[in-house]
Amino acid sequence: ESASSYYKELRVAPLMIKPRMCEAIDGEIVKAKAGKPARILMKSNAITDRDMIEKLTEASRAGVKITMLVRGISCLVPGVPGKTENIRIVSVVGRLLEHSRIYAFGVGDETTVFLSSADLMTRNLDKRVEIAWPVNDPALRARVLDYFTTMLSDTAKLRELQSDGTFTDLCAFVPEGRNPFDAQDHLIKEAYIAAERARATGLTYPQFVDAAVGGTP
């Protein structure tokens, strides 16, 4: 009996995350080759896994538009003609040491979004127990995608990886007299506002129980 039969929603490494992710990338490749809009969004601390690099390069060559937020190491070089010209890699290193991993495939209402504990590294995908799970709620899925828009709008800390391995500081392109937009500061302010609104309305948050045994929290 396969390991996947034990799970309804979870994708669990080392057996499931990489194959399922490659399947999702293949789905976007099929769309691109058919002349349909195809997109991949990824947020990871690093990308060093050869299989993922080769698969994303294949997707780029097929015409899939790929945008990646990679805070640290990237062994994938974007903007190489004929190979990775459809890949954009940016990095935001600011006040918050972010560790969230997001993997999204598709365009518009057909976008599928996964959150994960796994970076795009061989040690995470092939040698550790890691998990990935889909964001099925439409409102939450939209919120995650809006997060990407916010981060990519950063003009204070965003740096873009070039094909020669250097980074371009986008803050240098902010018009004189205009304050740079700091995405992390913006998200912090949003969190404070949401917390104040929750307190004012008496909103309570759900508590979790062990589904296997039931009971009360």
Predicted region positions:
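PLD/PLD-like phosphodiesterase catalytic module centered on the HKD motif
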Residues: 2-7, 14-217
